[in-house]
């Protein structure tokens, strides 16, 4: 780099997306041979865009334009504190404190390091992690149904953060008033007496969560948002109604506060903000489980001190025991002081465009790291391991791309090897982030869109939803390239409903039930039309993909909530407030309880092996459960949701009784009846996709299964009884997920995992190696060896992609060994350039050696000439 060129561009519009600005920046940069930094101006905002360039690998005289990095929407007045800090850090004076700047090359490197999103993410995670471990010592959540106080407070605090971070993103979009997070303005809203009290959390946050975001706006439903009525004659007319405001005495002017600060916030739905305090009836006796503690009773034990949110003073605390350090000082400050120091973006960064701001993907990382502070598999705390196992973005992107290519290539027509290779190249171009047009003909486009609509993906250990989000965003991008105006995608959704109507006419004999159901389906066509007409193209793509294609299981209910959070944010990003319209033109969030379930995915409840006996019962159940789930997904009215929940519970009870009559094991039938998918606190002790989703199999299973050593598996005896062919008493937990994936897949379905690589060579991996060699078609095996994918972990890893299909005798698969010293930014290029092939039949059961034929021949010669260690005395 010998020089820089700066350009300023004044745009006419008021609002530009990151992608729009990135595309403009790329087009302008194409015209110049030297780096160009562009300053966009529009509507009193400024965006700075820098395009990363690298030398073309084939033509060294040309550059390839890669990622566009932006400091976006800098206000020219009342500039965000985080933007001021970023711009100050880019000054020559500030750069010179850390770097020697004596050329454009060194200046470029210093700027790149300063704008590195990874460094920003690390800084934020460090601050939030410190805050979390400071707060955990100060909060008290009600006992609920969790006896362990440490676990209860950990989960309660993570749940609080989940809700609050979503609210913060809403604030960034202008949907919630800044005043509710401003310590100075809050003194005029609520009564603060002592920073150790919980006035802020109770009066502002709980009323915001449960009585505002979970309640329709007053202008749409009169008197919906109000304080609960006074208790008279020991009668509480609004007892246990958690959608009404509480803590009236904490406000200076309660008669005004709703209209001034809460009335114009849109209703969200979606379950994220439902109060978890519940009433249960057992033997005609009512009792109450308090989890959120949304109550102004004097005996409410809930405590979340105000200083955790509002303190602006940095203080030193001792976290050495938690982090496994010695004599180190850690700094903490109030949560809002931390959040105000960073800029947030609701759009997830991609490999080709990123904003210097915190995006939802980072939040997945943060929450998954915090979840690691309590391990439900081992029932032990492992706080110093926090941050070990979150799958890096580049690994997620790679696994997502390869899974989609493996799925879609089998959907496209081809008759020769050359045609298949040609289709694969076209698919890679389709998935690659580029402004080049795709190369598929109209017939192939229709096939691809139909295949995407039929796609079923599950992550059986979804954690914070990294893979599900990665798949969602990549499929949205594919649909954008194949069908830029959503014409075909819209028609696909309407065709789906028309098929259901046709099936309903044939299968339902009761005329009234039939016509009622058909009318509901016709209404849903109108809803589809409205969605596509009124909302952003990407919103319509995401909504129907989430409904039809995306499924997740995790043993931690709070992990399911975090996955929901990320999916919800992805829908929020494509919506904008419209004054005067119902709910400000914001479409309420869907209900995801029927797509994301808390369960032990490794413990099956088998129906399939008795299908000949129960076939009719099961088919009838699947038909009804799918209809319930379709209706529930988009239901917004609380009364309607309660009605659907009750009807589904009745269906499961009837299904359970039918199974019992047919000699199905009584305890398993009871498990089906007792399972409640709508309770965000419960964990199903079993997993069965038919019962939970109305599905028998999936096209893609993708996961980063939990890393739990065999001696710490709490339910090893259940695994032994669950019929796993690969069971070994010394196997680590992740190995069972391989066989689980195989069972969940349809024929030719794809499994893509990243796990420890011990199974490739260890004795406990023998059965797994044999199982995969005999029953699957390996496609890709990547051995990372000493290369640390998980930066704060010492686990050596591998990625494997296989098809559920018997391998032909000459079947070849791709493999690569990653050197330990490879730089992370060079990983994707290394994978592309260094893949080799190996015959699957040459893999030996006692150890898988990933090497080309020359190495394998040498290994064979050595083994023939030598004497195995086990044969020595």
Region roles according to the model:
Residues 1-28:
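Short Lys/Arg-enriched alpha/beta "domain-start" segment
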Residues 1-2, 87-108, 175-183, 278-314, ...:
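Short, compositionally biased low-complexity segments
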Residues 23-28, 445-447, 537-540, 582-585, ...:
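Catalytic micro-motifs at enzyme active sites that drive phosphoryl/nucleotidyl and oxygen chemistry
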Residues 33-37, 43-95, 99, 109-140, ...:
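Signature of N6-adenine DNA methyltransferases within the class I
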Residues 99-173, 177-178, 320-541, 545, ...:
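Class I S-adenosyl-L-methionine
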Residues 100-103, 172-178, 452-454, 458, ...:
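Class I S-adenosyl-L-methionine-dependent methyltransferase module
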Residues 111-123, 144-152, 156, 192-196, ...:
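Generic amphipathic alpha-helical segments used as scaffolds and interaction surfaces in large
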Residues 235-376:
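Long recognition/docking surfaces used for binding and targeting
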């Amino acid at each position: 780099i010998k020089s820089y060129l700066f350009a300023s561009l004044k745009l006419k519009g008021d609002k530009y997306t990151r992608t729009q600005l990135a595309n403009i920046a790329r087009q302008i940069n194409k015209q110049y041979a030297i780096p160009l930094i562009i300053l966009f101006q529009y509507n009193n905002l400024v965006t700075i865009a820098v395009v990363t360039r690298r030398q073309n690998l084939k033509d060294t005289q040309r550059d390839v334009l890669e990622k566009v990095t932006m400091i976006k929407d800098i206000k020219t007045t009342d500039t965000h504190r985080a933007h001021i800090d970023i711009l100050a850090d880019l000054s020559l004076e500030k750069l010179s404190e850390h770097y020697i700047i004596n050329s454009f090359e060194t200046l470029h490197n210093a700027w790149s390091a300063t704008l590195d999103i990874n460094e920003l993410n690390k800084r934020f995670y460090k601050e939030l992690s410190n805050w979390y471990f400071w707060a955990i010592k100060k909060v008290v959540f009600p006992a609920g149904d969790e006896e362990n106080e440490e676990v209860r407070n950990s989960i309660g605090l993570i749940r609080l953060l989940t809700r609050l971070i979503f609210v913060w993103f809403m604030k960034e979009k202008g949907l919630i008033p800044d005043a509710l997070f401003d310590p100075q303005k809050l003194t005029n809203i609520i009564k603060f007496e002592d920073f150790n009290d919980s006035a802020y959390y109770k009066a502002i946050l709980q009323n915001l969560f449960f009585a505002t975001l979970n309640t329709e706006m007053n202008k749409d439903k009169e008197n919906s948002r109000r304080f609960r009525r006074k208790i008279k004659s020991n009668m509480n007319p609004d007892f246990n109604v958690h959608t009404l405001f509480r803590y009236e005495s904490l406000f200076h002017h309660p008669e005004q506060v709703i209209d001034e600060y809460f009335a114009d916030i849109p209703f969200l739905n979606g379950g994220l903000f439902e109060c978890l305090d519940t009433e249960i009836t057992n033997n005609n006796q009512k009792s109450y489980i308090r989890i959120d503690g949304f109550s102004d009773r004097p005996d409410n034990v809930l405590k979340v001190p105000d200083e955790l949110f509002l303190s602006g003073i940095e203080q030193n605390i001792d976290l050495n025991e938690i982090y496994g350090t010695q004599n180190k000082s850690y700094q903490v400050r109030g949560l809002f002081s931390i959040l105000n120091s960073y800029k947030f973006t609701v759009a997830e960064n991609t490999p080709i465009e990123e904003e210097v701001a915190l995006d939802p993907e980072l939040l997945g990382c943060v929450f998954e790291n915090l979840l690691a502070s309590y391990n439900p598999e081992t029932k032990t705390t492992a706080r110093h391991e926090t941050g070990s196992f979150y799958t890096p973005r580049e690994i997620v992107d790679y696994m997502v791309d390869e899974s989609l290519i493996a799925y879609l290539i089998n959907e496209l027509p081809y008759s020769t090897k050359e045609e298949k290779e040609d289709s694969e190249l076209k698919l890679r171009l389709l998935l690659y982030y580029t402004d080049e047009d795709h190369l598929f003909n109209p017939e192939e486009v229709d096939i691809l869109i139909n295949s995407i609509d039929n796609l079923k993906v599950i992550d059986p250990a979804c954690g914070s939803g990294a893979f599900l989000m990665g798949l969602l965003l990549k499929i949205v991008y594919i649909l954008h390239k194949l069908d830029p105006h959503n014409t075909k995608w819209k028609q696909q959704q309407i065709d789906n409903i028309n098929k259901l109507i046709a099936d309903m006419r044939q299968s339902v004999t009761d005329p009234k039930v039939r016509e009622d159901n058909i009318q509901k389906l016709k209404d849903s066509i109108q809803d589809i039309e409205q969605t596509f007409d009124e909302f952003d193209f990407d919103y319509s793509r995401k909504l129907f993909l989430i409904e039809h294609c995306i499924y997740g299981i995790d043993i931690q209910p709070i992990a399911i909530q975090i996955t929901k959070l990320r999916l919800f944010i992805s829908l929020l990003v494509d919506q904008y407030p419209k004054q005067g319209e119902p709910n400000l033109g914001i479409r309420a969030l869907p209900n995801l309880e029927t797509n994301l379930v808390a369960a032990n995915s490794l413990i099956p409840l088998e129906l399939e092996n008795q299908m000949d006996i129960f076939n009719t019962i099961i088919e009838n159940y699947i038909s009804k459960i799918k209809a319930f789930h379709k209706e529930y997904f988009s239901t917004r009215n609380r009364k309607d949701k309660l009605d659907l929940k009750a009807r589904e519970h009745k269906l499961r009870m009837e299904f359970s009784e039918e199974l019992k009559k047919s000699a199905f094991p009584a305890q398993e039938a009871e498990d089906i009846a007792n399972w409640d998918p709508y309770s965000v606190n419960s964990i199903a002790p079993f997993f069965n996709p038919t019962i939970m989703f109305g599905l028998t199999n999936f096209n893609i299973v993708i996961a980063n299964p939990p890393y739990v050593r065999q001696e710490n598996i709490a339910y090893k005896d259940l695994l032994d009884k669950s019929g796993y062919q690969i069971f070994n008493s010394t196997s680590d937990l992740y190995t069972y997920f391989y066989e689980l994936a195989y069972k969940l897949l349809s024929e030719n379905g794809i499994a893509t995992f990243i796990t420890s690589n011990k199974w490739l060579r260890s004795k406990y991996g023998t059965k797994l190696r044999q199982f995969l060699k005999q029953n699957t078609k390996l496609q890709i095996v990547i051995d990372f060896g000493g290369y640390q994918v998980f930066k704060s972990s010492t686990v050596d890893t591998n990625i494997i992609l296989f098809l559920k299909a018997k391998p032909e005798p000459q079947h070849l698969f791709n493999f690569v060994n990653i050197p330990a010293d490879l730089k992370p930014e060079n990983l994707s290029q290394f994978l592309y350039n260094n893949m080799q092939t190996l015959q699957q039949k040459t893999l030996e059961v006692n150890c898988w050696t990933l090497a080309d034929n020359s190495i394998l021949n040498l290994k064979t010669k050595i083994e023939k000439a030598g004497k195995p260690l086990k044969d020595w005395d």
